[in-house]
């Protein structure tokens, strides 16, 4: 990889040995006809193979767009589109040796935006030049320039209020083309909704002649006239911003699967579905459901989106999924509101939480703390804490129960609270190490830390038992929570299947934003997304008796959400510990340092951190790492940042 990076540096300094030729718009010459890997031999480095990526943006706005490219299984690097041709721009990427496949992503800036959300891969020709043509926003690419199609296409269509459709197209409309666009009812394509005006552009806005009723928001299609646009297909108009209205926000409804010995009540939310089906499975490994039950609409007066079903009999520990049929397509996924799941998170599991209470769960009080400024937190990873602790039984090492075997060590450290790195259900194979910041189901404890990951109830019992043991030892428990993104945002994910595009922030054209640096951002400004976070926090407080929360990338969350969190949590636990990171993974900061003033929540003080240890990229040293350091920042931090960004010392954490 060092040779790969060195060759990149050589390439950036080396002028391309190309002769630019003029060509007709439809004539896209191959760089491979004029370029060979041997042309890049310099300073003892030899490129065995080359990848040429041609890139076309209909709007011709190429500034700051670049390629992130990596050999499959290896490290990545950035490359610029530094050459022009009739297609647009292109980059030449050298490889000292030829990997079987190379992955690439086209991005804007330093992950400000992705051109296409998924990784794409190219098989390289050993000892030769591999050349592909990529059009902005399209997942498919071609190695044959004769197959390039630059005709107008719809990238996305979204109903953002009852009368406005946001339309993302590959180029602005030309004069007269607006008359060839129609909005139709999916159930009756002869029923047309008249377009009043079109605000033209790469992102066009269609104003309809009338409001779309709440019952019809997921029934629209957009049709481009074939005579004008050629072989154009109908496009689904997804309900997006329109779903933020109160008509689609049953905020008082309790969602999830609630089990007793007599029956289980299933309640879920999908304001765009025509049909919601419950799929019950015999066991977590079963591939086909044993029963399929249609849910009924359970809408409150004036509100839509709730679905429910009551199934008789004792379903405790029975796996299930939902099938949501919307926009003419079925989408299956685990229940986003579930309280248990199988080991690989592919199935939700019904549980009666009252049957999974360990000894002492109901009568072990949570430790109180006299002053928040006296709290001393110790951050631990469940697996790491006991994995090499020899007195712990082998079967319990790396588990929730393993923590209970060495509580004396925590007392020796003098800490008052344990901060658990994420224990919510995350995407990882059984036994695979993971930090936990890739959450799948937020109300489910991770089975990897249970003594029996194959038993969906084991993680619940054992996490509760661990918390009881820590409380009995006068230690509080704080959960690290990661509500700023999810492990999957696809159409068959827990948050994608019920309401596509609702739970995630998107650009006007429908691409996921990357506020968190992980490829998606949870849209907590939307009522039901905010409700999900609040209900989830209440679940952990009431069902696990935790004592507080540490919010990963708190800066991604809207101030209204943070205020609602403080209100909900403090109502249940007035002494709860709340703190978080006042920054993001690269997106705009919504809740930064200073936003917490007057609220019962603290934020990390990176001013103090950097003054002591230096900055994150190692370009500057701090007080503890070399000569220097901002002594004033250290003094302000020790004083609780009251002369910096806080109103009270309790609003910062060091």
Where are these predicted regions, by residue range?
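Acidic, low-complexity Ser/Thr/Gly/Pro-rich repeat segments typical of extracellular/periplasmic
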Residues: 164, 170, 174-231
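Bacterial N-terminal signal peptides
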Residues: 8-19
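Short, surface-exposed loop motifs enriched in S/T, G, D/E and P with embedded aromatic residues
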Residues: 76-85, 189-200, 289-305, 309
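Conserved alpha/beta catalytic core and glycan-binding cleft of carbohydrate-active enzymes
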Residues: 343-344, 348-355, 566-654
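Short, surface-exposed alpha-helix to beta-strand junction/turn motifs within ectodomains of secreted
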Residues: 63-73, 166-194, 274-292
């Amino acid at each position: 990889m060092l040779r790969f990076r060195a060759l990149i540096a050589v390439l950036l300094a080396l002028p391309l040995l190309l002769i630019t030729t003029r060509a007709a718009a439809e004539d896209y010459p191959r760089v491979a006809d004029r370029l060979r890997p041997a042309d890049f031999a310099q300073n003892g480095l030899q490129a065995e193979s080359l990848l040429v990526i041609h890139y076309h943006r209909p709007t011709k706005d190429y500034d700051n767009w670049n390629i992130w490219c990596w050999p499959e299984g290896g490290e990545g690097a950035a490359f610029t589109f530094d050459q022009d041709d009739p297609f647009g721009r292109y980059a030449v990427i050298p490889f000292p040796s030829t990997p079987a496949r190379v992955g690439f992503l086209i991005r804007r800036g330093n992950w400000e935006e992705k051109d296409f959300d998924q990784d794409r891969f190219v098989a390289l020709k050993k000892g030769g030049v591999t050349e592909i043509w990529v059009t902005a926003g399209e997942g498919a690419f071609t190695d044959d320039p004769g197959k390039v199609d630059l005709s107008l296409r719809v990238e996305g269509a979204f109903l953002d209020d009852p009368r406005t459709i946001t339309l993302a197209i590959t180029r602005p409309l030309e004069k007269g083309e607006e008359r060839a666009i129609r909005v139709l009812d999916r159930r009756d394509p002869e029923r047309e909704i008249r377009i009043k005006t079109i605000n033209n552009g790469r992102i066009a806005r269609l104003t309809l002649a009338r409001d779309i009723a709440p019952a019809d928001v997921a029934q629209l299609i957009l049709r481009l006239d074939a005579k004008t646009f050629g072989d154009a297909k109908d496009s689904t108009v997804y309900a997006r911003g329109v779903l933020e209205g109160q008509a689609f926000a049953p905020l008082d409804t309790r969602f999830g699967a609630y089990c007793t010995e007599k029956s289980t009540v299933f309640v879920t939310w999908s304001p765009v579905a025509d049909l919601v089906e419950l799929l019950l499975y015999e066991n977590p490994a079963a591939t086909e459901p044993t029963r399929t039950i249609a849910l009924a609409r359970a809408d409150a007066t004036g509100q839509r989106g709730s679905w429910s079903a009551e199934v008789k009999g004792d379903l405790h520990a029975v796996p299930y999924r939902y099938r949501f049929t919307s926009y003419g397509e079925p989408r299956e996924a685990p229940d986003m509101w579930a309280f248990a799941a199988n080991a690989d998170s592919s199935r939700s599991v019904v549980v009666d939480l009252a049957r999974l209470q360990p000894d002492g769960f109901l009568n072990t009080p949570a430790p109180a703390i006299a002053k928040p400024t006296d709290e001393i937190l110790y951050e631990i990873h469940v697996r790491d804490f006991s994995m090499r602790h020899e007195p712990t039984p082998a079967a319990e090492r790396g588990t929730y129960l393993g923590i209970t075997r060495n509580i004396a060590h925590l007392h020796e450290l003098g800490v008052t609270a344990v901060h658990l790195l994420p224990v919510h259900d995350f995407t990882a194979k059984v036994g695979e190490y993971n930090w936990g910041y890739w959450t799948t189901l937020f109300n489910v404890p991770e089975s990897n830390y249970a003594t029996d990951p194959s038993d969906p109830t084991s993680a619940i019992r054992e996490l509760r038992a661990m918390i009881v043991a820590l409380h009995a030892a006068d230690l509080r428990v704080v959960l690290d929570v990661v509500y700023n993104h999810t492990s999957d945002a696809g159409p068959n994910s827990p948050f994608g299947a019920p309401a596509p595009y609702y739970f995630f922030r998107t650009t006007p054209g429908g691409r996921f934003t990357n506020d968190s640096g992980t490829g998606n951002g949870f849209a907590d400004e939307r009522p039901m997304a905010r409700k999900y976070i609040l209900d989830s926090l209440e679940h952990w407080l009431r069902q696990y008796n935790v004592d507080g929360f540490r919010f990963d990338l708190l800066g991604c969350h809207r101030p209204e959400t943070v205020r609602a969190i403080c209100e909900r949590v403090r109502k249940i636990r007035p002494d709860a510990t709340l703190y978080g990171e006042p920054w993001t993974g690269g997106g705009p900061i919504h809740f930064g340092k200073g936003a917490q003033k007057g609220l019962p929540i603290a934020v990390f003080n990176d001013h103090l951190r950097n003054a002591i240890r230096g900055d994150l990229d190692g370009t500057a040293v701090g007080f503890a790492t070399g000569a220097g350091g901002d002594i004033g920042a250290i003094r302000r931090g020790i004083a609780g940042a009251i002369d910096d960004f806080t109103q009270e010392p309790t609003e910062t954490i060091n």
